[in-house]
Design a protein with these regions (language model features):
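Intracellular loop-helix junctions on the cytosolic face of multi-pass helical membrane proteins
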Residues: 2-57, 184, 212-351, 355-360
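Short amphipathic helix-loop junctions that connect adjacent transmembrane helices
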Residues: 80-101, 346-360
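Interfacial helix-cap and linker-helix signal at transmembrane-aqueous boundaries
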Residues: 86-87, 123-125, 210-218
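Cytoplasmic loop-to-transmembrane helix junctions
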Residues: 101-102, 185-195, 199
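Central cavity-lining transmembrane alpha-helices of secondary-active solute carriers
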Residues: 103-124, 171
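Primarily marks hydrophobic transmembrane alpha-helices of the MFS/SLC 12-helix fold
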Residues: 133-134
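C-terminal ends and interior cores of transmembrane alpha-helices
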Residues: 139-157
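Intracellular juxtamembrane helix-capping segments at the cytosolic ends
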Residues: 169-183
Length: 360
């Protein structure tokens, strides 16, 4: 996945030209800027300590704070009313699923958001760079919110899927872009990320209040429309503020070679076939679609996590000191998994409890 902690050192690799070279540097060399109509003509390549703006931070940080605040506004605003929308009756403007089915959908949605950060990071790190990955993810999210504003079952489910996919692309890569604003020895990094996380909390605090009020007075689709507006603001800030970013945001740190791309596509196809086989086997055993989906939603990410750690430990690009650090990271990773398991209950079990046991 894309590395967020340092800016790359410009360099080049030698080799025989191939047909892939004609793709406007979409498969760029490490440290080379990709060719895109969105890339500014001038970008900072000097040490980050020379880039000073608001709060003595890099000039690109305030724009990324705006992006993150509005993106989290849209995400948490939608999530605040999503379970109620799924389980409410059709006459009440919902999708009419049972409470159990709704809980499973919410769990799968939360799993997908984090799980899809893996392909989102791969696209940024190996194919199109973090800025374009974030842009495409934001566009997909806004399209999903717009679909949710349309009172139709098909568009509603489409919107949920699009938001999950888009969030998987934008969430890891926006953090990467912020990390790329600082050099390794820049002491302002910690303060910058504190501001970044503060922007997350601001957006997450305000959005449920607004979407909940809109849902109460004008219906679910009005609540989802506020999420779409929030994402539009995020995209506007992201595009307008791109001139303030470092060159790192527009590079492909570890470009994929054609033969690696073929292996990646075949591997992805194999994973999809394996997941389909697991789901079919579970359905044959349980005979209950909800149980099957819930079980698959547990087994697939666990298997993916194990496989990901195996790949990182066995990769020739990982040095011995890095493997030592990776082993030390595993307990922290397990703790983070447990934390987010509890946190994600806010959109599921906690939402059901609040709906059934509180009277506001």
């Amino acid at each position: 996945m894309a590395q967020s902690e340092s800016s790359p050192t410009p360099g080049s690799t030698s080799g025989t030209a191939t047909a892939a070279d004609d793709r406007e540097d979409e498969l760029a060399e490490p440290g080379r800027l990709i060719s895109s109509r969105w890339r500014p003509r001038s970008l900072r390549t000097t040490p980050s300590r020379q880039d000073r703006g608001l709060f003595d931070q890099p000039r690109g940080l305030p724009w990324m704070l705006n992006v993150e605040m509005w993106e989290r506004f849209s995400y948490y605003g939608m999530r605040a009313i999503l379970l109620y929308f799924i389980t409410d009756t059709v006459a009440g403007g919902g999708l009419g699923l049972s409470e159990t089915s709704g809980q499973v959908v919410i769990a799968l949605y939360g799993m997908a958001v984090y799980f899809l950060a893996i392909p989102g990071g791969i696209f940024a790190d190996r194919i199109i760079g973090p800025w374009l990955s974030t842009l495409y993810g934001g566009v997909v999210i806004m399209a999903g919110h717009i679909c949710l504003t349309i009172p139709s079952t098909v568009t509603s489910w489409t919107g949920i899927v699009l938001v999950a996919v888009g969030t998987g692309f934008i969430k890891p890569n926006l953090t990467t872009i912020v990390g790329g604003l600082y050099d390794d020895d820049d002491i302002r990094r910690d303060a910058g990320f504190q501001l970044f996380y503060m922007s997350i909390n601001v957006g997450a605090f305000a959005s449920p209040l607004l979407t909940g009020w809109l849902r109460e007075h004008y219906g679910y689709h009005a609540g989802f429309s506020s999420a779409a507006v929030g994402m539009a603001f995020a995209l506007g800030a992201f595009v307008y503020g791109r001139h303030k970013l470092s060159a790192f945001a527009f590079t492909v740190p570890n470009p994929i070679r054609p033969e690696e791309l073929r292996r990646l596509l075949l591997g992805t196809l194999g994973v999809l076939v394996a997941v389909g086989a697991v789901v079919a086997a579970l359905q044959a055993v349980t005979g209950n679609l909800v149980t099957t989906v819930a079980t698959a939603g547990l087994l697939v990410p666990v298997g993916a996590a194990v496989a990901y750690f195996v790949v990182m430990f066995r990769s020739p690009k990982v040095t011995t000191p890095e493997r030592t650090h990776l082993r030390a990271y595993i307990p922290l990773w397990i703790g983070a998994v447990l934390f987010f398991m509890i946190t994600e209950q806010a959109a599921g079990k906690m939402a059901t409890f609040a709906d059934s046991n509180t009277d506001l």
